[in-house]
């Protein structure tokens, strides 16, 4: 192997190691949940009556053994990956029963107009990607219509 090829291979290897280390230490900045765990309107887009409704429904559903369904609105997630942000939020906040893994996070990001529904593995048979996709499409259509 020529010196040029060895140097090139060494450079590529060093860049690969650097990239892996940067990715491994990339931190997603997750806010703390509010005292009203089921509704976290950091974008200030939900009126107080609707917040109260979501909170009371979430509390009652959880008290009756149902999964925890949490709503989070953010103005921005500062360039973070939507999926990574939602997964890390669900983990940090401990959404759902740990053993049943039955939490649901509904995330709305205002600046990018993204909606994501993060579903714990314990609910994927009931709330699969297809159902979540239809819900998001219907919600998007309703929001667009005003």
Please name every model-derived segment:
Residues 10-21:
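Bacterial N-terminal signal peptides
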Residues 25-146:
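Folded, non-transmembrane soluble domains that reside on the lumenal/extracytoplasmic side of membranes
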């Amino acid at each position: 192997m020529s010196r040029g090829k060895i140097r090139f291979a060494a450079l590529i290897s060093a860049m690969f190691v650097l990239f892996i280390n940067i990715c491994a230490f990339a931190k997603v900045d997750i806010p703390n949940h509010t005292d009203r765990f089921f509704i976290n309107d950091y974008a200030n887009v939900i009126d107080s009556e609707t917040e109260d409704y979501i909170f009371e429904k979430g509390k009652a559903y959880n008290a009756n053994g149902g999964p925890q369904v949490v709503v989070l609105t953010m103005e921005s997630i500062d360039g973070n990956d939507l999926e990574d942000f939602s997964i890390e939020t669900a983990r940090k906040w401990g959404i759902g029963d740990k053993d049943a893994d039955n939490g649901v996070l509904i995330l709305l990001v205002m600046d990018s107009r993204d909606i994501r529904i993060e579903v714990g593995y314990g609910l994927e048979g009931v709330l699969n990607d297809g159902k979540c996709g239809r819900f998001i499409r219907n919600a998007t259509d309703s929001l667009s219509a005003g």
